[in-house]
Amino acid sequence: MSKVTQIAHPLILHKLAIIRNKNTGSKDFRELVEEVAMLMAYEVTRDLPLEEVEIETPICKTKCKMLSGKKMAIVPILRAGLGMVDGMLKLIPAAKVGHIGMYRDEETFKPVEYFCKMPQDIHERDIIVTDPMLATGGSAIDAINALKKRGAKSIRLMCLISSPEGIKAVMDAHPDVDIYVGDIDERLNEHGYIIPGLGDAGDRLFGTK
């Protein structure tokens, strides 16, 4: 069964409040999304396996713990998921980055895939799918479907804010995928947008309409 983790760290909630503010411009919005992604990545990677290694300090030899070299991949859902990648790469710079492009049909609210490019060994990697907003859950579900078709077995989903409906939809469709969110909002409105939300994350990241 999926595990849902709300990473309610004071720094994350503070930065999310600024991100939500309609008066926050694209430059600050981009920087804050990157910062929150980096802070969240700290928790998302908490259970990475460690191994004991021997190193030599300027004083003596000693044993320390280091990451065991498990392969990782970050897969942003385009466009908005791109804004979270650089923050995560600061903590896990060896991760490879795949891309899934989706847009939402404004009439059906359903996602349409238009691009997918993955590392050749994606099936061997622990994958973190990124999208700032988990609204209906449709894009995340389809992105995870696309990864599983390519043999992926270890997948986590990381979002800045989510709706209860989106969380339930992903859990029902993919009970093996753990979900990490910065904040859980009230609900979706009749147009499928998160309330109170933060607007269109892609438009606010890139200054488009």
Swiss-Prot record:
HAMAP family: Upp_B. 5-phospho-alpha-D-ribose 1-diphosphate binds at residues 79, 104, 131-139, 200. The keyword Membrane does not apply. PANTHER family: ADENINE PHOSPHORIBOSYLTRANSFERASE (PTHR32315), URACIL PHOSPHORIBOSYLTRANSFERASE, CHLOROPLASTIC (PTHR32315:SF4). The gene is upp. Belongs to the UPRTase family. Binds 1 Mg(2+) ion per subunit. The magnesium is bound as Mg-PRPP. It is an enzyme of class 2 (transferase). Disulfide bonds: none annotated. It catalyses: UMP + diphosphate = 5-phospho-alpha-D-ribose 1-diphosphate + uracil. Keywords: Allosteric enzyme, Glycosyltransferase, GTP-binding, Magnesium, Nucleotide-binding, Transferase. It holds the Pfam family UPRTase. Pathway: Pyrimidine metabolism; UMP biosynthesis via salvage pathway; UMP from uracil: step 1/1. This is Uracil phosphoribosyltransferase.
